[in-house]
Regions:
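Rossmann-like NAD(P) dinucleotide-binding subdomain of oxidoreductase/dehydrogenase enzymes
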Residues: 125-269, 396
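ALDH superfamily catalytic-core signature
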Residues: 225, 233-376, 439, 486-493
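Proline-centered turn/helix-capping motifs that create local helix->coil transitions or kinks
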Residues: 114-129, 311-315, 346-353, 359, ...
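Short, well-ordered beta-strand elements within core beta-sheets of diverse protein domains
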Residues: 33-40, 57-61, 148-149, 259-262, ...
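Hydrophobic face of amphipathic alpha-helices that form TPR/SEL1-like repeat modules
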Residues: 1-30, 55, 356
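Residue-level signal for inorganic ion chemistry
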Residues: 31, 69, 91, 113, ...
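Glycine-rich loop-to-alpha-helix module at the N-terminal edge of alpha/beta enzyme cores
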Residues: 34-123
Length: 493
């Protein structure tokens, strides 16, 4: 089979790894190679970072007004809209996500660039009302310099966009390192950035493996900020690497999000919300609602109706319009899911649905929608992120118990609440220790809405105005208005 060949984007040029080494990317639906990419090493990282630093210092980028940067971002958003079908098809092939879902994600990506473009010239400083009549002071937001974006395999386009747009709006340059399992659409985004008129070297993309390429990037002394999305184990390596140079960090990590269904909820909507929360994207989402908390009055009915609905999910080729659940993105992740399912069975969780690979003609990495009933929240399947189509359901008696179970987790990324009681919704939204709360909906996103978690789900926020400010340094400037000589040098003014 002929493989599609990709090159890296460094300084506006399409290049191979200096070593000439490559690696294959596998199609998850077929478990077969479909693309060949450069296997970058430390030397390639060095030239990418140096390219970004040179571009940051160049008048072609540094000399642009904020309004001009915003216009470039808006043009990039327009190009994404013009190329949406190509991008959707490419991502579906590369990481196994449903074509229905990739089309949906690509359709709202332009909004992220358009919204952020409008913020580029809104990064206002301020004057300080000093009580010192001979001094004047003001603040200004300035770009940081070279920043790095580490992108996972589950939603590379979306998770690149929410790093790239604010970084450029603030005036930085960037080196992107996508997952070796899903690099194609990030490279395509770099091509569109060049087409939009963004100067060479402002957006660079290097491909390779985390322990080599990623590690070299995160410890590079010229990288002033790292935006990372991924698992906690890798994040710990990133934190240690970045500490060498005190680079700032934004970490969007895992979750074990509670999806709480009260007896007064609209059950039809709640069941669809549960399916969306855990079986969409084959459960490969940081915000997956993998812990289902159901009030005891409706517990049995809800579980039976959820089983009936989930058992009808159509598994198959992600590029088929009728498919509702595609494969896992990697063989390694499929093995992780199978291991956690085995642990759940050994611990006494009751398997109600799935728990195995489906019988399909394809050799891809598919897994059935799976549901466990659990009698305690301390079970491993209730505490560890699966990152697959595996939900665990537990009953609760009242609001207080639901809150206790919801907060009994090392994670705090997202939560869902299904109820008609407005007061209850507000109380739980206030008291649940999670960065995102959805009430009577799930997986809603907007360019205006910050994304990020509490506890072991990371820190920092992406999307919204705060995400752009997070890519700036705040400078304070003092001006002496007096014509008088400097007073006593040993007394602080």
């Amino acid at each position: 089979m002929s493989l599609t060949r990709f090159q890296m984007c460094i300084d506006g040029l399409w290049v191979d790894a200096l070593s000439g080494k490559t690696f294959d990317s596998l199609n998850p639906a077929l478990a077969q190679p479909w693309a060949q990419l450069p296997d970058a090493d430390e030397a390639d990282v060095e030239r990418a970072v140096q390219s970004a630093q040179k571009a940051f210092e160049s008048p072609a980028w540094r000399g642009l007004t904020a309004t001009a940067r915003g216009k470039l971002l808006r043009r990039l958003g327009d190009l994404i809209a013009e190329n949406k079908e190509q991008l959707a098809q490419l991502e579906s092939r590369d990481n196994g996500k449903l074509i229905r879902e990739t089309r949906g994600q690509v359709s709202y990506l332009p909004e992220f660039f358009h919204y952020t473009a409008g913020l580029a010239d809104k990064l206002e400083g301020g004057t300080l009302p000093l009580d010192k009549p001979d001094l004047f002071a003001y603040t200004v937001h300035e770009p940081m310099g070279v920043v790095a974006g580490i992108i996972p395999w589950n939603s590379p386009l979306y998770l690149t966009a929410i790093k790239l747009a604010p970084a450029l709006a603030a005036g930085n340059t960037i080196v992107l390192k996508p997952s070796e399992h899903a690099s194609a659409t990030v490279l395509e985004l770099a091509r569109l950035a060049l087409e939009a008129g963004i100067p060479p070297g402002v957006v660079n993309v290097i491909t390779g493996y985390g322990p080599t390429t990623g590690a070299a990037l995160t410890r590079h002394p010229l990288v002033r900020k790292i935006a990372f999305t991924g698992g906690a184990a890798t994040a710990r390596h990133v934190v240690r690497s970045s500490a060498e140079n005190f680079a700032k960090l934004s970490l969007e990590l895992g979750g074990k999000s509670p999806n709480i269904i009260f007896a007064d909820a609209d059950l039809d909507s709640a069941i669809n919300g549960a399916v969306a929360g855990i079986y969409a994207a084959s459960g490969q989402s940081c915000v997956s609602g993998s812990r289902l908390l159901v009030q005891e009055e409706i517990y049995d009915e809800f579980v039976e109706r959820l089983i009936e609905r989930a058992s009808r999910i159509r598994i198959g080729n992600p590029q088929d319009e009728t498919t509702e659940m595609g494969p896992m993105a990697t063989a390694q992740q499929l093995a992780v899911v199978e291991g956690l399912v085995a642990d759940a069975l050994a611990e006494g969780a009751r398997l109600r649905l799935g728990g195995k690979r489906p019988e399909l003609a394809s050799d891809g990495w598919f897994y059935e929608p799976t549901l466990f009933e659990c009698d305690r929240n301390s079970m491993k399947i209730m505490q560890e992120e699966v990152f697959g189509p595996v939900a665990s359901v537990i009953r609760f008696k009242d609001e207080a118990e639901a809150l206790a179970i919801a907060n009994d987790s090392q994670f705090g990324l997202a939560a869902g609440i299904w109820t008609r009681d407005l007061g209850r919704a507000h109380r739980l939204a206030r008291d649940i220790r999670s960065g995102i709360i959805w009430v009577n909906t799930y997986r809603a996103v907007s360019a205006m809405a910050p994304i990020g978690g509490f506890k072991n789900s990371g820190y920092g926020r992406e999307s919204g105005i705060d995400s752009v400010l997070a890519y700036t340094e705040l400078k304070t400037v003092w001006i002496n208005l007096s014509q008088a000589p400097m007073p006593d040098p040993f007394v602080m003014r």
